[in-house]
Amino acid sequence: MQYKISKTLAAAMLAVMVCGNAYAFEKPVLLEDQGSFFAGGTVVTAPGSFDYTNPLNPAGQTLHGDHAYVFYQKPVGAHKLPLVFLHGAGQSKKTWETTPDGRDGFQNIFLERGFATYLIDQPRRGDAGQSTVSGTINAVPSDQFWFTNFRAGNAPDFFDGVQFSRDPEALNQYYRQLTPDTAKYDAKVVADAVSAVMDKTSDAVLITHSQGGGTGWLAAIKNPHVKAVISFEPGSAFVFPKGEAPQPLKTSSPFGPLTADTVTVAEFDRLTKIPIVIYYGDNIAESYTDEWNKDSWRIRLDMAQKFAAAINARGGDCTVVHLPDIGVKGNTHFPFSDLNNKQIADLMAGWLHEKGLDK
């Protein structure tokens, strides 16, 4: 005897199973659809012909790589525009999932709020590790560098009042979240793949973090399906019209001066057609300091403000929010997974509503 399970019943069963997890949603989420796919990428073909008797010879064989991987979930009755999430350097889609201390991340929080979510692993990272160019992964101890650079504190000490759990297991999970590039990072390759994702999602809001900020601008320039950009602590690759880039910003950071990238005026003007908001956390210096992590993010915040000013001077809509300036204290480089991430989610949801993006 065969049994048929309706799509709604299957979704309800999935919701129950999801909610049985130790780190479950605060309330059940009924999913209409869930799945994954690859987007973009290229195919390399070796010269010659494939020889069945010598299959390890690459002649005539193909290599599919440099694509993005996407995991998505769509709740029943979802808002019109989905949210597409792009991680930063040394990270993967895990950035947006369960937080290091086991709470709901933005994936779950915004599913609960009725948004379809699409989580990207960019080319040459995470589940999109297949590259069309060779690369080397060097196993170099660097956890404490990232702890410090991401402004949880000055390793091994946490900053006073920082929004990060002091549970040792949370720090263990935080470090294990780091993941390498399988080959050289290429902003154009990433932007092309993100644009291909947008072709599949159609109109959506793009949410980026750190290194993902720069490729996010390029994807928004390239693809009109990007209807808004929300960027958390973009760290580099701010774009300006050719001839209008600011001078490099000096810092005590080991990364060295921060330079701006340039695009054509026509390309830059595409960024003036969509709303953009940029968020930065706490423990960022106000003036030059030898405390390099705070100084590194000082110049990045400064460049973001120059970027916003350039957009707004052309009639655009770009806002930079330094969270301490609005009374939100203690955030690290990861506001969306910090202890107060629901407060950050409220800010983001409020902005989406203000811009009419949550219909």
Each predicted region: which residue ranges?
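The feature captures the conserved acid-bearing segment of alpha/beta-hydrolase catalytic domains
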Residues: 234-314, 319-321
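Active-site glycine-rich loops that stabilize anionic/oxyanionic intermediates
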Residues: 87-92, 96-99
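Gly/Ala-rich beta-loop-alpha elbow adjacent to hydrolase catalytic centers
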Residues: 207-216
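Short beta-strand element of the alpha/beta-hydrolase
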Residues: 80-88
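N-terminal cap/lid segment of alpha/beta-hydrolase-fold proteins
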Residues: 25-78
